[in-house]
């Protein structure tokens, strides 16, 4: 879902309201002055003067205020930082987040290497090209282990805010290395409104604007590079955790994870499970029920 934030003049806001007055709808949010339900989009006009447009038709209505969408190809031809995470949907293993800095002169090399969204590449291909990317591309990789994940979730963070913290920190540390991107793109995992809300909790900040875009790994090579390196980091962590416990840990959160989790629970108890899995997943309760049979 597209999400666009603007700060137009009060005159333009009133003109917009007059034009779309039949689409005005009630809102329980005390910070929203006006809320409009339009075909393929919603528009929230805040007391601060900001406007949030969301939905497939967001760009169409944003054009009323002079907004012009940047073509994907033009964004691709900029020095760019792209970020992505892997492990969020897997019960076992940590959460890997990577920020990568890619310049246009590296595009041919990356395409010849076969860089693409990690979801479209085999694990074998990822393990093959990731070491090359780590050597050739400036990046910052972060891995939150399952044990640390379990420690912070429910305390200071939730499943979304912890990703905001990791993406922000990866970008911050990469910028500290001296790279100068003209654009920063995050593969969207939440709304811009949510991202900004959780970002306010973080200490390390930077002034560069960011763009949250859905399916960004298919649009920007910098995000694709991050996707591949993050997947490699996640797979390596999954293997290492399994080796220490003596089990082959599956990726994902299906019945295979339930089965292995129950075996680990029986052998090592909750301490062993906390070492290798994200405990707030439903798989934990399913594993317990397996042992009760």
From Swiss-Prot:
Its main location: cytoplasm. It catalyses: Endonucleolytic cleavage to 5'-phosphomonoester. It is found in: Cytoplasm. One of its GO terms (biological process) is DNA replication, removal of RNA primer. SUPFAM superfamilies: Ribonuclease H-like (SSF53098). Its EC number is 3.1.26.4. This is Ribonuclease HIII. It is an enzyme of class 3 (hydrolase). InterPro entries: RNase_HII/HIII (IPR001352), RNase_HII/HIII_dom (IPR024567), RNase_HIII (IPR004641), RNase_HIII_N (IPR024568), RNaseH-like_sf (IPR012337), RNaseH_sf (IPR036397), TBP_dom_sf (IPR012295). Endonuclease that specifically degrades the RNA of RNA-DNA hybrids. It comes from Streptococcus pneumoniae serotype 19F (strain G54). Residues 78-293 form the RNase H type-2 domain. Manganese or magnesium. Binds 1 divalent metal ion per monomer in the absence of substrate. May bind a second metal ion after substrate binding. Signal peptide: none annotated.
């Amino acid at each position: 879902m597209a999400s666009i934030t603007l700060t137009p003049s009060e005159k333009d806001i009133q003109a917009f309201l007059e034009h779309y007055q039949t689409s005005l709808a009630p809102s329980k949010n005390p910070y929203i002055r006006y809320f409009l339900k339009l075909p393929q989009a919603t528009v929230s006009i805040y007391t601060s003067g900001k406007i949030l447009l969301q939905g497939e038709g967001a760009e169409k209505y944003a054009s009323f205020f002079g907004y012009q969408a940047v073509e994907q190809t033009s964004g691709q031809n900029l020095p760019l930082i792209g970020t992505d995470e892997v492990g969020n949907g897997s019960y076992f293993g940590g959460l890997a987040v990577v920020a990568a800095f890619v310049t246009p002169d590296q595009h041919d090399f990356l395409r010849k290497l076969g860089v693409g969204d990690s979801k479209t590449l085999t694990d074998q291909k990822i393990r093959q090209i990731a070491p090359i990317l780590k050597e050739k591309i400036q990046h910052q990789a972060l891995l939150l282990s399952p044990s640390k994940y379990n420690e912070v979730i429910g305390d200071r963070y939730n499943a979304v805010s912890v990703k905001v913290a990791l993406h922000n920190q990866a970008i911050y540390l990469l910028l500290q290395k001296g790279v100068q991107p003209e654009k920063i793109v995050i593969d969207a995992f939440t709304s811009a409104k949510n991202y900004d809300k959780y970002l306010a909790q973080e200490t390390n900040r930077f002034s560069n604007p960011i763009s949250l875009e859905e399916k960004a790994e298919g649009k920007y090579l910098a995000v694709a590079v991050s996707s591949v390196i993050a997947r490699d980091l996640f797979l390596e962590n999954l293997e290492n955790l399994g080796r220490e416990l003596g089990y082959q840990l599956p990726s994902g959160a299906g019945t295979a994870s339930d089965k292995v989790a129950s075996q680990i629970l029986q052998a090592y108890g909750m301490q062993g499970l906390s070492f290798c899995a994200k405990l707030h997943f439903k798989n934990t309760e399913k594993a317990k029920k397996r042992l009760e049979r």
